[in-house]
Amino acid sequence: MPDPLPDLSSLRLAYTRAELRRADLDPDPLRQFQGWLGEALQAGLREPYALSLATADASGRPSVRTVLLRGADERGLTFYTNYESHKGHDLAQNPQAELLFFWADLERQVRAYGPVERVSEEESTAYFHARPRESQIAAHASDPQSAPIANRGALEAKLAALQAQYPEGTPVPRPDFWGGYRVRVREWEFWQGRPSRLHDRFRYTWEGEGWRIERLMP
């Protein structure tokens, strides 16, 4: 039996690492995000480009999972996945999403919300072939993603068959069901933990010609 959990209501940390002032913010939220992500990478955080991706289906039922950020530029934030996955079905029905980056060691988090679109076939193919060969084959093996499977052995047998189909030196084609999505961010929030839970929060909202920046109550 596992050890009993401690009283979770008594567990807390004091956030004292830094503050975030309006004067500290870049007028462009993308540059602000790139700066914070760069600091997280320099600090040696484990996979600071990992994010929680929240989607909802047509009925409004939400779901969330962790994916990896694979691009951040003026077009938006990009990730790759199986289009037939749960998230892929959600985004086909309801093409909007919210992303959350949480960097505990820096006492920071970033939220980003916006409509979602698929990246071009060419962009998906270029990224697919930049991945390790084992990951390319695994993309084929894990289809249909999120579907029930009898056991681990069935998955490994499928992988072995694909490895035989695509021996070393043979190009692995990008499957039609796999590719990228880009979130065209229309709202950002930057959060810096502060003492006594009086955190610093700033929201950027796109207003058609520029970004409006507001401090939010903690």
Curated annotation (Swiss-Prot):
Reactions listed under catalytic activity: pyridoxamine 5'-phosphate + O2 + H2O = pyridoxal 5'-phosphate + H2O2 + NH4(+); pyridoxine 5'-phosphate + O2 = pyridoxal 5'-phosphate + H2O2
Cofactor(s) needed for function: FMN
Alphabetized GO MF terms: FMN binding; pyridoxamine phosphate oxidase activity
Residues the entry annotates as binding FMN: 65-70, 80-81, 87, 109, 145-146, 191, 201
The entry's keywords: Flavoprotein, FMN, Oxidoreductase, Pyridoxine biosynthesis
Highest taxon of the lineage: Bacteria
Functional note: Catalyzes the oxidation of either pyridoxine 5'-phosphate (PNP) or pyridoxamine 5'-phosphate (PMP) into pyridoxal 5'-phosphate (PLP).
UniProt protein name: Pyridoxine/pyridoxamine 5'-phosphate oxidase
Organism ancestry: Bacteria, Thermotogati, Deinococcota, Deinococci, Deinococcales
